[in-house]
Amino acid sequence: MAIRFFKPTTPGRRHGSVLNFDDLSSKKPEKKLTRGWSRAQGRNNKGRITTRHRGGGHKRLYREIDFIRNKIGTSAIVKSIEYDPNRTARIALVCYKDGEKRYILSPTGLKVGEMVIASPNAPITVGNTLPLYNIPLGTSVHNVELQPGAGGQLVRSAGSVAQIVAKEGQWATLHLPSGEYRLIPQKCWATVGRVGNLDNSNITLGKAGRSRWLSQRPHVRGSAMNPVDHPHGGGEGKAPIGRARPVSLWGKPALGVKTRKRKKFSNNLIINL
């Protein structure tokens, strides 16, 4: 998928770029697989802000994605490749032999008219889903389960890919996009291939308005606030923060401080090379 640039008629056009949508199918979303979606706007059930810098954004319909791929042994044909405003990856509409339609993540190289299947004995081709114990070493995978039958939770964003590097006992070692090597049960399922829309990370928004369309509000520095609003606030002009180290809005150490729980269970499943 190529990136489009525009004539610099405005500053936003000059600095911005967009993805080329020519390879997408020109059809409306499947009505039975979409539903209305109300934004949380970064608030919890009490209406209090739990995630700052969220709010606004363009109205969307949510597409229900099949991350579990639990129609075992039934092949499906790819009917269309579509845009999904709720994720960076593209989605593919597949139709099974019994007539059921589902959305799946569209991997790189998947084309309309091709067949995909979820089966322990499926061929190692792009879009097929298998348990890890039947996928050869060195294979690129995405939409990886953490627990058998729970549905894919890892490696789902545009252009991301994991690689199976080892198998021993009931565990498979995967090299994740973060660089982490993690043990995953071999009974977990994964989809062969790399998530599509590789150029997503190369686009430039170009103007503040495009961030607002995506529900991203301005991220204001603490040093630009008043003392009542942030521990870094106040002072005459561009004053230093006046502390030994940076802190968050609530006075907790920030910037370079580890936030992961030291006794978290999954620490045993992460391999430190």
Swiss-Prot record:
Residues 45-55 have a biased composition (Basic residues). The keyword Plastid applies. Coiled coil: none annotated. PROSITE patterns: RIBOSOMAL_L2 (PS00467). It is found in: Plastid. Its main location: plastid. It holds the Pfam family Ribosomal_L2_C. GO terms for cellular component: mitochondrial large ribosomal subunit; plastid. Residues 30-55, 222-243 are annotated as: Disordered. One of its GO terms (molecular function) is transferase activity. Keywords: Plastid, Ribonucleoprotein, Ribosomal protein. GO terms for biological process: mitochondrial translation. Part of the 50S ribosomal subunit. Belongs to the universal ribosomal protein uL2 family. This is Large ribosomal subunit protein uL2c. It comes from Prototheca wickerhamii.
